[in-house]
């Protein structure tokens, strides 16, 4: 039995995400999207009357996935948990990499996204602070409250701008699918290395060994 075709709106969002990630949102027109889908511009307009609505719909999906992931922050109890949490975050960033690649451009023309991005930064900062609180409570880190505040902010900054850094380093290939694994590992490693100075006892050697493995 043939599978029922995905609803048109779902197909539109899937193809739009691929195109945005590949070419960057500013370089993708609704004409290109409808052509790639082999549907009429009118059909695309029926589902999403403006390109901003496509961006907002994709951001909502990203936000839902991000919120679910960040809700796991209280469960980070050791170095391995922290590595897995960080790597999973970077996988999500990669999946919606156009948001990070074109962040300044998107913010300059989409007021709704502007507010949502701000909320997202606060949510990430809170989640990272929760991770640091948990690791301090478990004795993995020896870190003060003020150090946790600063480190959580540094982690969010690095997570948010890592792909931009990768893109500047290698603009022709950094955001291509074949570069994903290496980029994600580098990003997760560098963010996690921010907690290394605070690692307590044997946890420092454990963390250094984990970072060296990647």
Regions picked out by a protein language model, each given a short descriptive name:
Residues 11, 19-53, 57:
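Helix-turn-helix
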Residues 2, 164-214:
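C-terminal peripheral helix-coil segments that are non-catalytic and often amphipathic
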Residues 71-98, 152:
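Hydrophobic alpha-helical connector segments
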Residues 8-15, 151:
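N-terminal positioning helix adjacent to the helix-turn-helix/winged-helix DNA-binding module
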Residues 1-9:
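Short, Lys/Arg-enriched anionic-surface-contact patches
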Residues 60-66:
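Short, basic, alpha-helical segments at the C-terminal edge of helix-turn-helix-like DNA-binding modules
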Residues 93-115, 129-133:
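Amphipathic alpha-helical segments used for helix-helix packing
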Residues 112-138, 149-164, 182-194:
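Amphipathic alpha-helical packing segments from all-alpha helical-bundle domains
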């Amino acid at each position: 039995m043939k599978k029922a075709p995905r609803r048109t709106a779902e197909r539109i969002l899937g193809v739009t995400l691929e195109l945005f990630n590949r070419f960057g949102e500013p370089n993708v027109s609704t004409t290109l999207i409808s052509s790639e889908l082999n549907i009429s511009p009118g059909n695309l307009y029926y589902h999403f009357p403006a390109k901003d609505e496509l961006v907002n719909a994709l951001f909502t999906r990203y936000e839902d996935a991000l919120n679910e992931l960040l809700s796991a922050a209280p469960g980070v109890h050791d170095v391995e948990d922290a590595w897995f949490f960080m790597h999973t975050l970077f996988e999500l960033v990669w999946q919606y990499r156009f948001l990070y690649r074109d962040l300044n451009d998107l913010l300059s023309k989409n007021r709704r996204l502007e507010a949502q991005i701000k909320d997202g930064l606060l949510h990430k900062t809170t989640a990272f602070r929760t991770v640091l609180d948990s690791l301090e409570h478990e004795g993995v880190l020896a870190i003060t409250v003020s150090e946790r505040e600063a480190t959580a902010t540094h982690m969010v900054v690095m997570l948010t701008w890592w792909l931009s850094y990768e893109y500047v380093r290698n603009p022709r290939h950094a955001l291509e699918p074949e570069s994903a694994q290496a980029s994600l590992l580098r990003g997760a490693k560098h963010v996690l290395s921010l907690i290394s100075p605070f690692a307590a006892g044997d946890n420092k050697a454990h963390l250094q060994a984990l970072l060296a493995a990647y």
